[in-house]
């Protein structure tokens, strides 16, 4: 089996939850119009919907309004995605910076253990990833498959981010259950079983 197919299998196994974040956003004429289309929603459900949509779409005005109203910055949806994870994944650096400034938890994990940093690395959001690397999180924080942000950076060839993670204290020799390390991955070695 060639290297590409091994890499493709590992990539699929390790990134499936991150790709789920890119599901299409349902655009409505306005937030109010979406409420009228779903009147059975409680006020809390509506606010949650506004919060997550604003994070995905980069709507800083709605984010600021809800922050000012003391909305729970770390509230997560049914998949464990926080507004910070969604904003990082969708490339909204102004929203990421505002959420961090307001006190959002940069170390929050979704239901698969992935963080906003892992999503930013996956999507090549370098500026956002650098911001999140500087946050007060364990540099080697693994997801529930034992994979770290450094492994993602190595897998996707994000050399600049891999160096930044190493400078922040990431152990490039920390292994996942298959024996993969960021160092090995960056050298083209990838174990799939």
Where are these regions (language model features)?
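Conserved ankyrin/ankyrin-like repeat signature
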Residues: 62, 94-95, 127-128, 160-161, ...
